Amino acid sequence: MIANKYDLISKIGAGAFGAIYKGQNIRTGEPVAIKVEPLKHETNLLKNEARIYQYLKGGTGIPQVKWFGVDDTNNYMVINLLGESLQHNINTYGTFSLLNAIAIGVQMIERIQYVHECGLIHRDVKPDNFLFGLNEQRDRLYIIDFGFCKKCNNPQTTTPTTTPTTAPPKKMTSILGTPNYISISVHDYIEPNKHDDLESILYTIMYLYYGRLPWDTPGITNTEIRNMKQVLLYGAGTATTIPKIFTQFAYILSTYREKSNEPNYKSLLELLNMFTNAK
């Protein structure tokens, strides 16, 4: 029992930080998820994650922290129990129709827009990090795992009458995130910004539709993945090889990346909603 209030029932997941358990509030019977992180971890990932959830509290699709605490051996975080991840859905049930993949994409953009408006960049957008709710929330998408999250760094400045001025982009010494889903810029070791979260959403939508991304090949190099993404989205002839909505999404992203540090969420959402409403 944890905090004289929560019982551990069964292990439902694991990660670099430790383990995730299904639990129950013994006073109310409410099902919960309990993350357990051994204190031997010097980074305190779980404590940082709890702080971020508290900071984002109140946003649609943000897990609710019900309790955080420490004992002699572990950090504990209790949040509302969620359903299956997008990745689990693919593994278990197969791919989504294009219509459903796009509808899920709308929710992903809405979640990321809220995170960005709160001054944060997620930096690890992928199917594992979006979960559906349970029961009456089963159609609502939740965003999780803010281990790579960082405050926004916006080197561009604009005024209504001037062209954006851009400081040299910050370079990284290693790739950050999951190679299948990171942006082309991150493949170039450029520190992620808001646009990169949205580009990762595009690759996630494509994955939901195809079930496998074309660069998901054993032994493929970072440069090869980067070049395949570049050719697929911006190369000649792509309009005949992938659904047009994917190249339209990429065009909006690239256009506004050049103009401003602020993505055009409105245009992206209009594009996806126009597609779903037409079906």
Task: List each language-model region with its residue ranges.
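Conserved N-lobe ATP-binding subsite of Hanks-type protein kinase domains
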Residues: A19
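Short beta-strand micro-motifs within the conserved protein kinase catalytic domain, predominantly
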Residues: Q64-N75
